[in-house]
Amino acid sequence: MAQVDSQDRWGEASPLSSLTEEAHDTQMLSMNLESDDEDGGEAEKEGTADPVACPRGSSPVTHENPDLPWPHPLGKEEEKFSDSSSAGGMGQKPVEMSGKASWSRDVTKINETQGSPGASRALGSLPSGLAHKLLGQMQPLGDRLPAGDDGYSGANQDAVLDVPPSFPSNGKYLCAHKSVDTSAGNSSLLCFPRPGSNWDLPTQETHTPAQASATPASLAAAVLAKARNSRKVQNQAGRREGGEAEARPYRCLRGGRAFQKPSKPLSPAETRGGAAKRYACELCGKAYSHRGTLQQHRRLHTGERPYQCSFCDKAYTWSSDHRKHIRTHTGEKPYPCPDCGKAFVRSSDLRKHQRNMHSNNKPFPCSECGLTFNKPLSLLRHQRTHLGAKPFRCPACDREFAVASRMVEHQRVHSGERPFPCPTCGKCFTKSSNLSEHQTLHTGQRPFKCADCGVAFAQPSRLVRHQRIHTGERPFPCTQCGQAFARSSTLKRHQQIHSGEKGFLCAECGRAFRIASELAQHIRMHNGERPYQCEDCGQAFTRSNHLQRHRAKHGTCKKEPIPSSSDE
């Protein structure tokens, strides 16, 4: 509300000034009321009338009090209007109190005044608009206002109830003096509501000296600002509480923080270094202690691979995997085995090598044959040989496998893929184990020796199979005829005799073979490949057994074990 000078408020914008023009019409009303009760009027002028018996029940009001906070611009005609309106409309009587006069409502007097014949005749001679206003002023202060000309009858429930009635006008009320105390600095005003206004009536208050020193505009501005701020704070608090309750309905019982999704309580295992895992994934609910770790975890859901290899087209999610992959191009192997000196690209590969090759700790024995293994997965694979379970089927030839990796290696036979090349001679292999065995031909390194005969082998699996010759162990029996074999590959060949299965077809001539090694040897006849060459004369052969027979002809040739691609 803008600050307005008190003189301007009483001059142009005051609602009392709009009624000044109608004050001449109200003289007839006051004369009629005085003629109906002439005796009461004379007693009132002489000051001897009983205050209780006075039909108007009001003392004369003086507008020339110098203690008022603003000058009154109205003349004697307004005084007449004030006397008549207060006498006919208020129906109140003064009560003797110490120092000042107080007022009490008398609804019976108001009803009697409204129903008097003189008042009815006087109101009937007035215009309808003015009579409507006077009747609105004669209602008790506690009643709700009637509907205005615009038909709006609902009272504004958000009206400011603590607006002091001491300032003259705010566009909704008409103010008139109630009484003037004999003591200096004490005065009070009565606010008459305008008919048709949608404001609730304010409570009557006594005008204090502190209020008298302030201007009406400043008082109204302060009150409205206070109410506006209080409603604003309440609305913001309600929206904040309601929005938070709707968006974050789950609250921690210990810390008081609110969350969008429920989660189980944190256990000691879910904290690292005493720090709670506060950053939870929105998709799977997994929590982390640091925001950066959560951002890296989100790549698993989005499929983002920001680490691109500069040598090939492969990309990786984690920087550690990217560094390990780079070592395959550079040939770096920073993890050597302390027992045999073999180096590895990954530390996990070194641990696996030490566990499989150099460790004698094999706590997982097979209940069927007693063979021990160093990890439960190896035991599970071995037990499938006894049970005959082969859950992995090749989609090309319907061949079944007990291990998924064996099926992947088998599918390379159909596709012709050989992803493991020899860095020395360039020969490619379908299995990494076959490449390792082939590389021993170039290096001559055979670190695994038999304790019985002293024969050395490049792979520990070769040593294990060789030791079965001395022990006579045959751990792979046939489920149909009961015949046992020392090697699993030999058992597979034998089982194909019973089934008659030949799942390996030659793409050139259509000939079928039972095992992949036979198909590989057959394909060499079509492409002319001769990978087995005699070191003495340089003659090459398609099969390793042909090379062995050729060496037998040379007296100086030594018979060396040739690795077979079909053996495990």
From Swiss-Prot:
Residue stretches in coiled coil: none
Q: Which UniProt keywords apply?
A: DNA-binding, Metal-binding, Nucleus, Repeat, Transcription, Transcription regulation, Zinc, Zinc-finger
SMART domains per the record?
A: ZnF_C2H2
Q: Where is the composition biased (Basic and acidic residues)?
A: 1-11
Give positions of the C2H2-type zinc fingers: 279-301, 307-329, 335-358, 364-386, 392-414, 420-442, 448-470, 476-498, 504-526, 532-554
Its domain of life reads: Eukaryota
Report the GO molecular function annotations.
Answer: DNA-binding transcription factor activity, RNA polymerase II-specific; RNA polymerase II cis-regulatory region sequence-specific DNA binding; zinc ion binding
- Tell me the Pfam families matching this sequence: zf-C2H2 (PF00096)
Please tell me where this protein is predominantly located. Answer: nucleus
One GO term under biological process is:
regulation of DNA-templated transcription
Listed GO cellular component terms? nucleus
Cellular location(s): Nucleus
Region annotation (Disordered) maps to 1-106, 548-568
InterPro entries attached to this UniProt entry: Znf_C2H2_sf (IPR036236), Znf_C2H2_type (IPR013087)
What is the role of this chain?
Answer: May be involved in transcriptional regulation.
Q: Which family does it belong to?
A: Belongs to the krueppel C2H2-type zinc-finger protein family.
- Protein name (database record): Zinc finger protein 648
Organism field: Homo sapiens (Human)
